[in-house]
Swiss-Prot record:
Its EC number is 5.6.2.4. The keyword Lipid biosynthesis does not apply. A motif (Nuclear localization signal) lies at residues 274-281. It catalyses: Couples ATP hydrolysis with the unwinding of duplex DNA by translocating in the 3'-5' direction; ATP + H2O = ADP + phosphate + H(+). Residues 140-287 are annotated as: Disordered. GO terms for cellular component: host cell nucleus. This is Large T antigen. Forms homohexamers in the presence of ATP. Interacts with host HDAC1. Interacts (via LXCXE domain) with host RB1; the interaction induces the aberrant dissociation of RB1-E2F1 complex thereby disrupting RB1's activity. Interacts (via LXCXE domain) with host pRB-related proteins RBL1 and RBL2. Interacts (via C-terminus) with host TOP1 and POLA1 allowing DNA replication. Interacts with host preinitiation complex components TBP, TFIIA and TFIID to regulate transcription initiation. Keywords: Acetylation, ATP-binding, DNA replication, DNA-binding, Early protein, G1/S host cell cycle checkpoint dysregulation by virus, Helicase, Host nucleus, Host-virus interaction, Hydrolase, Inhibition of host innate immune response by virus, Inhibition of host interferon signaling pathway by virus, Inhibition of host JAK1 by virus, Interferon antiviral system evasion, Isomerase, Magnesium, Metal-binding, Modulation of host cell cycle by virus, Nucleotide-binding, Oncogene, Phosphoprotein, Viral immunoevasion, Zinc, Zinc-finger. A motif (LXCXE motif) lies at residues 137-141. GO terms for biological process: DNA replication; symbiont-mediated perturbation of host cell cycle G1/S transition checkpoint; symbiont-mediated suppression of host innate immune response; symbiont-mediated suppression of host JAK-STAT cascade via inhibition of JAK1 activity; symbiont-mediated suppression of host type I interferon-mediated signaling pathway. Residues 194-204 have a biased composition (Gly residues). DNA helicase activity requires Mg(2+).
Length: 777
């Protein structure tokens, strides 16, 4: 045995078989270890392809060398036996495998010669007439129970019922490859020399065992070939040391049987695990389609669920039904579907689908397994307990709908629409301002100081506090306050943009005037006189100011290309900025700083989106008529914005964090000091108003601090009052003529024409406009 493999290959083979060195040559244990390691190392079982290939190579070499060693043991191989005999009348051809099969005359003669070399006192077993007449394969054994051997019987026995000699190995088809054989007849004559005492038993160390036959047994004419199942049987018994007799086919069959036997005994069968037979009923690839709507189909999700459905074989589902207690199911049921089974269970705690599947996969290493979470437990239970499903068992009698429904709890949430309506009614486009109002509304209404005063500047609060108090309480504990307010502000901007698209500029002007008249209508007597003082101040600002204001409003409303821009030019403190601010307040617009660098001008112009008018405030130029003025980049920037000023084509306006929007740039009111304008810029202004310093107007403002504190001069309501005070109601839109007349009558009741003339005289004299008329506080 030491010559079978090299020392390195022998140690490597024992290492792969995981056997100690002293078991080298014990073919039975080595073959058993080979089967175990093949299951572990096979790639289909999760093993290593390289190790499996190496093990097959070494094991194939080992078996081939053992076979060659056995055939040439002691220098006397079967090849040296006589090839013919006159006794049998059968002359085997060269290398005829069946000529030296177990029990034949040549087999007996060969081994008798072998034993005589080792034991000169060895004698062949005696031949009997009975054994000659009825030849069979058997061996002599020592009697253990009785000193006298039982008489021979002629009772035939099946080959499977023969007694086994412990010193001789069972037939093994997997030891040697199928040698070439000569086609012979099925009913060939049996050699006369092949008698029942054809040979003695052999010990593992080569010694002989002598005994007496227990009787000859007849064999069928065509004994079936030996086929190993699940691998080759061991070459020897558990106490053999490596030398044992191989197995051979007792009788050749037809061509199909020879081919099948050759394939089963081919050397390639030892190089890899034989392929598994395909299942007659392949495992399903998914749950039945009737359950699709009740299962979660998420694969890469860590979400936890309380209900699960496991799909496997019937046997595995029954086993899982008994062992699923690890998850402490509150309810579980076992159902059958076609050739498989399903386990449906609910737990009081939530688990991941992967955790349930990993636990079930320990019991389903071969059987198919599918596991999914159940999103609709009650509906799923109703389906799996009806046809075509079959309910087998459940731990409690069914599920009921009331187990999944709680008593309805009224959970009030913030009314987002109510917040949006509040912002839209008051034209609030600042999210923080909306949030501030609503947080203020959460206070108790009876104890609210702002509501008790009812001041004009607080009218948004005291008009809406009681209406929004309940919703504000919910808003106070809401986690989405900023989102709600941002959405409300976006709604105001969206409504404003929609108006610009759907309404004409005349309609927008009418709406703005209507809002101003409503505010004027709510003024008290003292506030009314204060606004009339502002009207008197404006009438002293420019000659025929009411007509000038009317022309400006008409110019800005009609928005004719190249005939729509207004320029206010004059020295410092001449009233330019105050009038421009009042126009912006009346019409709705924004003030822009155009003196910034050109790279920042794009975002500054983006503020003009959705505006009725804009104001370029305090534009600076390079050439000043007054040497005390500082130069700036405003006029140069205006010269680069000719398309913006003309209003003939749409321009792109952009804001931060938003896309560019293409629209016509709104008409502008530009204020500036005494700077020289180039002809290209001068041509863009259709109306130019030159302001001059009037000391009496400045003195009147200084002496009446309320005009400055309440910003009456910069208010658009002052200009609206000036219009209705100096023009008849026929000039206004018919829709607001009634309101115009009502507001005019209200102010006429507070201030007569003679009283207004007194206010006008006070302004022209540089005194307090309300001197000797009203004590304003």
């Amino acid at each position: 045995m030491d010559r079978v493999l090299s020392r390195a290959d022998k140690e490597r083979l024992l290492e792969l078989l995981k056997l100690p060195r002293q078991l080298w040559g014990d073919f039975g244990r080595m073959q058993q270890a080979y089967k175990q390691q093949s299951l572990l190392l096979h790639p289909d079982k999760g093993g290593s392809h390289a190790l499996m290939q190496e093990l097959n190579s070494l094991w194939g070499t080992f078996k081939t060398e053992v076979y060659n060693l056995r055939m040439n043991l002691g220098g006397t191989g079967f090849q040296n036996a006589e090839r013919g005999t006159e006794e049998s009348g059968h002359s085997p051809l060269h290398d005829d495998y069946w000529s030296f099969s177990y029990g034949s005359k040549y087999f007996t003669r060969e081994w008798n010669d072998f034993f005589r070399k080792w034991d000169p006192s060895y004698q062949s077993p005696p031949k009997t007439a009975e054994s000659s007449e009825q030849p069979d394969l058997f061996c002599y054994e020592e009697p253990l129970l009785s000193p006298n051997p039982s008489p021979p019987t002629d009772t035939p026995a099946h080959p499977a019922g023969r007694r086994r000699n412990p010193c001789v190995a069972e037939p093994d088809d997997s030891i040697s490859p199928d040698p070439p054989r000569t086609p012979v007849s099925r009913k060939r004559p049996r050699p006369a020399g092949a008698t029942g005492g054809g040979g003695g038993g052999v010990h593992a160390n080569g010694g002989s065992v002598f005994g007496h036959p227990t009787g000859g047994t007849s064999t069928p004419a065509h004994p079936p070939p030996y086929h190993s199942q699940g691998g080759s049987e061991s070459m020897g018994g558990s106490d053999s040391s490596g030398f044992a007799e191989g197995s051979f086919r007792s009788d050749p069959r037809g061509e199909s049987e020879n081919e099948s036997y050759s394939q089963s005994c081919s050397q390639s069968s030892f190089n890899a695990t034989p392929p598994k037979k395909a299942r007659e009923d392949p495992a399903p690839s998914d749950f039945p389609s009737s359950l699709t709507g009740y299962l979660s189909h998420a694969i890469y999700s860590n979400k936890t669920f309380p209900a699960f459905l496991v799909y496997s074989t019937k046997e595995k589902c029954k086993q899982l039904y008994d062992t699923i207690g690890k998850f402490r199911p509150e309810f579980k049921c076992l159902v059958h579907y076609e050739e498989g089974g399903m386990l449906f269970f609910l737990t009081m705690t939530k688990h991941r689908v992967s955790a349930v599947k990993n636990y079930c996969s320990k019991l389903c290493s071969v059987s198919f397994l599918m596991c999914k979470a159940v999103t609709k437990p009650m509906e799923c239970y109703q389906v799996v307990t009806a046809a075509p499903f079959q309910l087998i068992t459940e731990n409690k009698p069914g599920l009921h709908q009331f187990e999944f429904t709680d008593e309805p709890e009224e959970q009030k949430a913030v009314d987002w629409i109510m917040v949006a309506d509040f912002a839209l009614e008051n034209n609030l486009d600042d999210p923080l301002l909306i949030m501030g109002y609503y947080l203020d509304f959460a206070k108790e209404v009876p104890s609210c100081i702002k509501c008790s005063k009812e001041e004009t500047r607080l009218q948004i609060h005291w008009k809406n506090h009681r209406k929004h108090a309940e919703n504000a309480d919910l808003f106070l504990n809401c986690k989405a306050q900023k989102t709600i307010c941002q959405q409300a502000a976006d709604g105001v901007l969206a409504s404003r943009r929609l108006k610009l698209v759907e309404c004409t500029r005349s309609q927008l002007l009418k709406e703005r005037l209507q809002q101003s008249l409503l505010r004027l209508k709510e003024l008290g007597s003292s506030d009314a006189l204060l606004y009339l003082a502002g009207v008197a101040w404006y009438q002293c600002l420019l000659e025929d100011f009411p007509q000038t204001l009317f022309k400006m409003l008409k110019l800005l409303t009609e928005n004719v290309p190249k005939r729509r821009n207004i320029l206010f030019r004059g020295p410092v403190n001449s009233g330019k900025t105050g009038l421009a601010a009042a126009l912006i307040s009346l019409l709705g617009g924004k003030s822009l700083n155009i003196n910034c660098p050109a790279d920042k001008l794009a975002f500054e112009l983006g503020v003009a989106q959705d505006q009725f008018v804009v104001c370029f405030e305090d534009v600076k130029g390079q050439i000043a008529l007054n040497k005390q003025l500082q130069p700036g980049m405003g006029v140069a920037n205006l010269d680069n914005l000719r398309d913006y000023l003309d209003g003939s084509v749409k321009v792109n306006l952009e804001k931060k964090h938003s896309n560019k929007r293409s629209q016509l740039f709104p008409p502008c009111v530009c204020t500036m000091n005494e700077y020289l304008l180039p002809q290209t810029v001068w041509a863009r202004f259709h109306m130019v108003l030159d302001f001059t310093c009037k000391p009496h107007l400045a003195q009147a403002l200084e002496k009446c601090e309320f005009l400055q504190r309440e910003r009456i001069i910069q208010s658009g309501d002052t200009l609206a009052l000036l219009l209705i005070w100096n023009f008849t109601s026929d000039v206004f839109d018919p829709d607001i003529q009634g309101l115009v007349k009502e507001v005019r009558d209200q102010f006429a009741a507070e201030c007569s024409y003679s009283l207004f003339c007194d206010i006008l005289c006070n302004v022209q004299e540089g005194d307090d406009p309300l001197k000797d008329i009203c004590e304003y506080s």
